[in-house]
């Protein structure tokens, strides 16, 4: 999979199937959108995820998002920060200049409450209208719900901040995980025959609250059951 961070101009991509959103955490709602663009690869389209905006603390790191999307079958991940140009671009111009002009879109998948463009005036209905005129198909997916609440990145963040790891697993479809750099300590665990590892997580990674968690650690193709103290 190709990863591109958009600093100025978008790349020229031919025949793309695109889904748009924040995608800071690839929860079950995002996964349905990604599955839709993957289906379009059978028609010769390139599956493109256009991630709009970035958060200072993310549910998934860039490396984690890239790995998950690549495993799902995505061809290109475009990360587009909300620059002055993007934030002030009218929705009509976003469709014409970026989706049609740069990405040569043939298919778009969005959620029913997706908004884009200046003052968030761009809607799924607008995408459908422009699609009829310019020759691309827009598929609008209903909200993925958990009871009466929409599954969203905000929902995932709230449950992670509460330390509700079972709910996190349900919303994301996978367990919480973290990769980091091992920092050597004073060797107290080794002294008492209780092996320990001090892991420094990425600074941008959103972590659960301080506390003790049952975990599985992976190292050199082996897995070790244990407990982890966060904090």
Q: What are the language-model segments listed below?
A:
Residues 9-63, 67:
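N-terminal catalytic cores of NTP/NDP-binding nucleotidyl/phosphoryl-transfer enzymes
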Residues 19-21, 49-52, 78-81, 107-112, ...:
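Short beta-strands and strand-loop turn motifs
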Residues 57, 86-89:
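Acidic-and-aromatic substrate-binding clefts and catalytic sites of carbohydrate-active enzymes
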Residues 27, 69, 108, 168, ...:
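Residue-level signal for inorganic ion chemistry
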